Design a protein with these regions (language model features):
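A conserved, positively charged/aromatic
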Residues: 113-114, 125-137
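An amphipathic, basic-hydrophobic alpha-helix
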Residues: 61-88
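Short amphipathic alpha-helix
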Residues: 9-23
Length: 188
């Protein structure tokens, strides 16, 4: 299954690295052009497999809407050109990055996975809710500060709950508790 992986933060690279290693050679990575992400991607020889990488800018600060629009346009052009020859993408997986999911819906990518670990990222949740087909939230999600987004997601998408603490997965994935060592079968 050809997959597009979206890395917005170094922790996302570490979180999704085992899944990327078990993917296919035709997978594509969309990575934010941040110093930490670029350094981690370039220094991961032997840890992360080499994949076609699309570097995009991070839409923050003054001009963030223009940057977001350029980011979506770049992703659309690159994914279209990568899909030529009949080798279409079947899935896109993004951690807190809804812009790529919006592009994926327009391109007809059937499985669009949104993973969130931050209850207060309301703007990203709003953008992802109408375009994601599946969403993953941790079991320790605090509904008292999420402004009702968990319920809103459960009405529109297939909602999955992931066991384990967020910090364990991001900081040292090899030290996760035994009961969550196996990757969930719905992402593999």
């Amino acid at each position: 299954m050809r997959t597009c992986w979206v890395f917005d933060h170094p922790a996302h690279v570490r979180l999704l690295a085992p899944f990327l290693r078990s993917g296919t050679a035709s997978d594509v990575i969309i990575a934010t052009n941040r110093h930490e992400v670029r350094q981690l991607m370039e220094s991961s020889e032997g840890v992360l497999p080499r994949r076609q990488t699309i570097w995009v800018e991070r839409p923050v600060g003054k001009g963030r809407y223009r940057t977001a629009w350029k980011r979506m346009r770049t992703v659309r052009q690159e994914l279209k050109s990568a899909s030529k020859g009949g080798n279409r993408f079947e899935r896109i997986v993004a951690v807190g990055a809804p812009l790529e999911l919006r592009v994926a819906k327009k391109l007809g990518i059937p499985n669009r996975w949104y993973i969130s670990d931050t209850e207060i990222n309301h703007f990203a949740h709003k953008l992802a809710r109408n375009v994601a087909t599946d969403a993953i939230f941790p079991n320790h999600w605090d509904e008292s500060i999420d402004d009702g987004w968990l319920n809103k997601f459960s009405q529109k998408v297939n909602l999955h709950r992931l066991n384990g603490l967020h910090g364990h997965v991001h900081l040292q994935p090899q030290l996760r508790p035994v009961q969550v060592q196996e990757p969930p079968s719905f992402v593999v």
